[in-house]
Amino acid sequence: MFQNNPLLAQLKKNLHAKTPRVEGIVKSTERGFGFLEVDAQKSYFIPPKNMKNVMHGDKISAVLKIEKDREIAEPEKLIEPFLNRFVGKIEKKDNKLFIFPDYPFLKDFIACRPKKSCVHVFQTGDWAVAKLIQHKLNGNHIFYAELIEEIVKANNPLIPWWVTLSRHNLERKEPKIEKDDLILKNNSHREDLTHLNFITIDNFNTKDIDDALFIEEIHNGNLRLIVAIADPTSYIKSGSKLDITAAKRGFTNYLPGFNVPMLPRSLSEDICSLNPHERRPVLACCITILKDGNICSKINFFLAWIKSKSKLSYDNVSDWIEKKSSWKPETKSIENQILLLHRLCLLRIKWRTSNAVLFQDSLEYRFQFSETGIVEDVVIEKRRIAHKIIEESMIIANISAANFLSKNLGFGIYNTHAGFDPINAENVVSFLNNYNLKFTVKEITTLKGFCNLRRVLNILSDNYINSRIRRYQSFGDFSITPSPHFALGLVEYATWTSPIRKYSDMINHRLLKSIINQDTNITKPSEDIKLKISEQKRRNRIAERDISDWLYTLLLQKKEFKNKKFNAEIIDVSRSGIRAKLLENGANVFIPALFLHPIREELVFNQETGKVFIKGVLYYKISDLITVVLSEIRLQTRSIIARIDH
């Protein structure tokens, strides 16, 4: 008699409307229960029985109920699943396939089957890309996935690379090339500079050589520098299939052990690469640097032919300048080039120290592998004088390009850095005041004031203060119109010196050429391409970090590291512990609260100040040097747990 009763239907509707509901993100725990995070301040408890219907990271709506005198969230509706397309490891049981998602907070296998178009035969230990097609909160009795493609077979030493690239949907092979891409298409006049003593300085094993340099002393102690850059845009037509592919990739993806090129290797490592004794087309820039270090305003961009006279390595050049080895340049003319470039480098470092912002030297770490791709060691690489020679030359070239584009077009792809936003600027001023460093918001939000602040901090040389100030700084970005680069201390900056490796530099090449050729219909780059380049840069950076984390866990699980003591620097303070970097090899480790002090209530982690207090006393802070011992290597989550060695 109650069937289709409108009064009953209305009553149900009213009850549903009155039942409190919330939306949020599911957060799981090690102990089976979870929480629904509504915002940074508010979360609701999800009992273990209800957690069985959701996954960590799911966005859901839930009904709020009182159960055993506690307010709980009962998942009701799936808004957006955490898993859609995902990567995981295959397990085969009783001829049935399961996939274990490769995400730290997901602990359960998901039943799966290959998609009809997927021809791979999967075995235990293989890795695959999958798509979640059934979710319990949608009324399905189990979670279920479809295998889209195989990533890599079990026990392949390249698992860390292929799985990570697949996770981030990044390419793992070089682009395909067509015959037309090998033909030089630009018939514009080129100056013949093949008689000049151009040299390249790079790593021993570098094959994609972008830049060559020639320098000479002219009147009054001034220096004339010609920067010659490889010219791939004379081979790759704008809008061609390869150009579209390069735009999509954005960058050559440099990963531990190898790279995935933006352009086909036949272009990037052969036809366009400025290999020694090979005649190559280039886009060149002639710049005069005055004896006080200033760049002369008269800048000339032009097309040319060059022939590099020697491929030099950073280590050999640095050793020779520092008189540390028996190596010496092949000829007096090459020797003279190195000496003049060294002089220019010191001149510009002095100028930038007083007028801009100088980079602080930092350690870089490089993995070493066996012939079969097994990680064997990590070596420290320091930035030496030859690195600085190239760096200063490229900075000169990029300042010149930005100036040239601004004067002639008013647009391009500019590298920018905004310094501090207004809110963070207030935090910086307040923080510095605690150390009797007096600055104003108005002052440090100008380029001049920001540079002055950085110079003061460089002189102060306090790692803790520097780390806190860096935390407040904006991230680097790209802009279509001229804009300052606060982190470099420059009014404008536009890179064009790596067109083999960066699509933004290819865009700037085409714009510079259009000015040289006096084209009238020059198209301004779109905001869309700028955003895509930024996003691709972010994804590449995350992939490189993820692979490194994986390799560190593989390396440090070896027996010889079990009880070894490591010097480390604290780099972050979180709610549950501290993160530190091992100085010997660059690995990041986590030290949980329990390993710092047995009574949790007596521990205070202040994330804002980056300090850890025990019973109200400051014990640790970011930048502190500590000694740690590895406690646990978690290969599944690629995390390294350590404890402080007291």
Curated annotation (Swiss-Prot):
From the UniProt record, list the reaction(s) this protein catalyses: Exonucleolytic cleavage in the 3'- to 5'-direction to yield nucleoside 5'-phosphates
Q: What is its EC number?
A: 3.1.13.1
Q: Which Pfam families does this one have?
A: OB_RNB, RNB
Q: Give the subcellular location.
A: Cytoplasm
What keywords does the record list, in alphabetical order?
A: Cytoplasm, Exonuclease, Hydrolase, Nuclease, RNA-binding
SUPFAM superfamilies tied to this protein = Nucleic acid-binding proteins
Name the family the entry cites. Answer: Belongs to the RNR ribonuclease family. RNase II subfamily.
Q: What name appears for this protein in its UniProt entry?
A: Exoribonuclease 2
Can you name the source organism?
Answer: Buchnera aphidicola subsp. Schizaphis graminum (strain Sg)
